[in-house]
């Protein structure tokens, strides 16, 4: 639920020489590899802006995991982790974090809008438990932009438009949670190789992302029991 607890898991895994990996399935989808190649090749030019949202509408349940602070409830850890992890993949560690939002009667984050700045680039992200949102994402740069259809965190359609007039629309992806097969296959390969960490989502990045969420919660005033 926070960076300190994640760091304890990482330290224990490294001390025992065993495999540990965050189950962030988006990182293991083929589209993520394509996005990484486009960024590495400079197809978008200098990246300036990342946009992403993830909102779903839930009936408030004070005892349910989404609204109960004792269960680390709130939009951030359940939904917001996807746009935040996406921004981390594209821009790396943020230099500054600015967040605003609303809190439920039970004391967890209901809705959060945030800006993560890395150098001159910014990620503008939103997450909410109060409404269903398009769950789309985009990356814009000096040479063009890339759009991901909703929900962007699963198998999504990519659309590339460049200032030079290049337009690419990829075919329909596999649907829904069938995309979890790529995460499972990657984990199986790591086990077969005797690896202790995934190169696609290093453990230090997992801890760093949670540290970002910790800072967002600090700004909002969300504290879990025992912290």
How should these model regions be labeled?
Residues 26-98:
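Predominantly a Rossmann-like dinucleotide-binding segment in NAD(P)-dependent oxidoreductases
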Residues 85-155, 185-193:
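Contiguous beta-strand/loop segments that form the cofactor/metal-binding neighborhood of enzyme cores
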Residues 1-24:
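Beta-strand-loop-alpha-helix segment that lines the small-molecule cofactor/substrate pocket
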Residues 173-185, 201:
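Active-site loop of classical SDR/Rossmann-like NAD(P)-dependent oxidoreductases
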Residues 24-27, 53-58, 103, 129, ...:
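Short, flexible active-site-adjacent loop segments at beta-strand->alpha-helix junctions, enriched
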Residues 6, 31-32, 83-84, 155-157, ...:
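A general structural signal for well-ordered alpha-helical segments in protein cores
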Residues 189-227:
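C-terminal helix-rich "cap/oligomerization" subdomain common to oxidoreductases
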Residues 71-77, 169-178:
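A short glycine-threonine-serine/GTX helix/turn-capping micro-motif
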């Amino acid at each position: 639920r926070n960076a300190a607890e994640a760091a304890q898991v990482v330290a224990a895994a490294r001390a025992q020489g065993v495999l540990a990996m965050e189950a962030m399935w988006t990182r293991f989808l083929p589209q993520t590899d394509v996005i990484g190649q486009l960024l590495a090749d400079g197809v978008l030019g200098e990246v300036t802006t990342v946009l992403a949202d993830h909102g779903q509408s839930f009936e408030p349940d004070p005892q349910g995991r989404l609204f109960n602070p004792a269960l680390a409830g709130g939009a951030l850890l359940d939904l917001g982790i996807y746009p935040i992890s996406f921004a981390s993949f594209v821009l790396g560690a943020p230099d500054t974090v600015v967040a605003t939002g609303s809190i439920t009667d039970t004391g967890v984050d209901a809705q959060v809008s945030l800006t993560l700045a890395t150098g001159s680039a910014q990620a503008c992200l939103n997450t909410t438990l109060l409404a269903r949102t398009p769950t789309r994402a985009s990356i814009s740069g000096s040479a063009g932009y890339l759009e991901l259809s909703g929900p962007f965190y699963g198998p999504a359609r990519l659309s590339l438009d460049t200032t030079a007039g290049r337009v690419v629309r990829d075919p329909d992806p596999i649907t829904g949670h069938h995309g979890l097969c790529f995460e499972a296959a990657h984990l199986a390969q790591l086990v077969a190789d005797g690896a202790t960490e995934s190169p696609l989502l290093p453990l230090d990045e997992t801890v760093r992302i949670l540290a970002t969420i910790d800072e967002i919660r600090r700004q909002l005033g969300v504290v879990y029991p025992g912290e």
